[in-house]
Design a protein with these regions (language model features):
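Short, structured secondary-structure elements
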Residues: 1-132, 138-146, 150, 155-200, ...
């Protein structure tokens, strides 16, 4: 349910997916969650997908965007996996060593353009001032995705930990979950660090992370009488199941 919303697995506006593509995309996600694929590997499979959106269902991630431009891919990927709403203006918050302009090459080659064309001879300047020259035979998309999903990139793990916390409690340790900024600090930095360390140490195992959250003292504590309850919107699937249970009509 949550993943379907995040990955826009639907054929209605604003997605541009055919119904058959949606079914294949949903099945791809279902199989990964059923097999408990590590989060980093699932994201790599998603972002490195190419080819037919029926034979390679994860390609629907890219096809679902209204604006299929390098900038839009960039902003949406960083919003989803790094929690950054405005990476174009604040690229330093997303990349520790890579600048925005220096990561456009691979996005210009996803599915739509010639992946074998020669890269432009631009300079790549790292955060420490080191200047690198693009290598012609480098797969820039793979380089970016491997950096994004690596355990060294803690933000990638932190954002997933925070999403799961939000799904359980209705409010993230960083709230909103998609708004990671210098002036939007975690409400409990130690809890976020502890869960992130656990998530990385267990090879991005999402089931173990969810289990740890559900067994936490926070989740199992009684609510304070004067405490504030955080209302949560029911997902569409839960509403449908509730109506089916009441009416006895499941088809």
């Amino acid at each position: 349910m949550h993943w379907g919303d995040i990955l826009r697995i639907k054929s209605e506006f604003p997605s541009n997916l055919w119904p058959n593509g949606v079914q294949a995309y949903n099945r791809w996600l279902y199989e990964h969650l059923l097999q408990n694929t590590p989060y980093d590997l699932m994201v790599r499979d998603l972002l490195l997908s190419e080819g037919s959106n029926f034979r390679s269902p994860a390609v629907n991630f890219y096809r679902g965007f209204q604006q299929r431009t390098p900038e839009n891919f960039y902003q949406n990927i960083n919003l989803l996996f790094l929690g950054d709403r405005n990476c174009e203006d604040n690229g330093h918050l997303c990349f520790s060593q890579v600048k925005f302009k220096s990561t456009k090459e691979w996005k210009e080659e996803i599915i739509y353009l010639d992946v074998h064309k020669e890269l432009p001879s631009e300079r790549i300047v790292l955060g420490d001032g080191t200047v690198l020259k693009p290598v012609a035979d480098t797969d820039w998309r793979r380089e970016y995705v491997m950096w994004l999903t690596s355990s060294a990139n803690r933000r990638f793990a932190e954002v997933m930990v925070n999403r799961m916390w939000f799904w359980v409690f209705g409010k993230g340790i960083v709230d909103e979950p998609d708004d990671w900024r210098e002036d939007n600090k975690p409400s409990d930095p130690r809890q976020l660090k502890s869960l992130t360390d656990y998530f990385i140490a267990n090879d991005f195992n999402m089931r173990l992370l969810m289990k740890k959250i559900l067994l936490s003292e926070e989740f199992n504590s009684e609510m304070a009488p004067a405490g504030k309850y955080v209302p949560q919107r029911l997902p569409a699937e839960v509403i449908v199941d509730a109506l089916a249970t009441v009416t006895g009509i499941w088809n």
